[in-house]
Amino acid sequence: LFDYDFKPMEEELGIDCFTKIENYQAIGKPELMYNKNVSEKVQALSERLEKTANEDEFFDHVTQFYKDYGVGMFGLNKAFRISDNNGKVEFQAINNMEKVMLDDLVGYEIQKKKLVDNTEAFVQGRKSNNCLLFGDSGTGKSTSIKAIVNEYYDQGLRMIEIYKHQFKDLSNVIAMIKNRNYKFIIYMDDLSFEEFEIEYKFLKAVIEGGVETKPENILIYATSNRRHLIKETWNDRSDVQVDNGMHKSDTMEEKLSLVHRFGVTINYSKPTQKEYFDIAIELCRRLGVELSDDEIKAEANKWELSHGGISGRTAQQFINYLLGKQ
């Protein structure tokens, strides 16, 4: 096929499309270009096929490609979201996912190790738990989960992002992926519920407590600024009883039972000022900002006072500001 001469056909039909294809030069993509990951893999396969000596070698390359990456959008994409098409749940690939790795997140080594240990057990087929990453905003919870997907994508890990209003579709989503030859993280960002919201009951039933056994290729990873996910009010304590010195409240237990369904909970707390300065200095060194440590500390301190306080996100925004001035 690669040696076939299309010129006689083009002359007969008065076309030149095959000549254009044969001389096509792909446009270079910057690092964060949409879907670069997919096009790189297809391009690599094309180059291997071009060098094949015979049909058997051609067949081996193609079958190995599908063995490594699977077929369809699950094969070539890392992350997905769901949509409702006239009552039918459909997956949509997220083509512009941030290409962040765990080493890009400065600090939080204990937290990252707990997340890595659980995820490695999952992709290797060992027992693992649903994870809740909770703590102050801007501390790297969402970044850690995105990085985990990037780190373990080549081992068959995929991510499906689901929003709170879509929890009613969770059972359908699980039914669609439970027999796939991939490991799926169902990702819920900024998970929390007001006292009047009942969507958490869908989530509780899916995580544990339903009749059907949870598939071994699915875990739920969630982030939240709240430790207990569901907002409590003093009314929740209205049914508190005293029984042999123990306080009990059915309403409180009902709400707290959701967080208990996450076997691994990881606290991402706000950094101290020293840790904040360390993050800012490390990011400056990585990205080539030419300031002394003392200058970075002074500027970072002024920045956080007027931009929402100390956090890893504040440090990153400060670095972006410095890079924009260069």
Where are these regions (language model features)?
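Interdomain "pre-motor" coupling segment immediately N-terminal to P-loop NTPase/helicase cores
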Residues: 26-91
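N-terminal pre-Walker A segment at the start of P-loop NTPase domains
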Residues: 94-120
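Conserved P-loop NTPase mechanochemical-coupling segment
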Residues: 99-103, 142-165, 193, 231-232
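Walker A/P-loop
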Residues: 130-160, 172-179
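Conserved nucleotide-sensing/catalytic segment adjacent to the nucleotide-binding pocket
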Residues: 157-162, 171-215
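Conserved catalytic/switch belt of AAA+ P-loop NTPases
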Residues: 194-244, 250
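Conserved AAA+ ATPase "SRH/arginine-finger" region at the nucleotide-binding site
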Residues: 241-256, 263-277
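C-terminal alpha-helical "lid" subdomain
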Residues: 265, 269-326
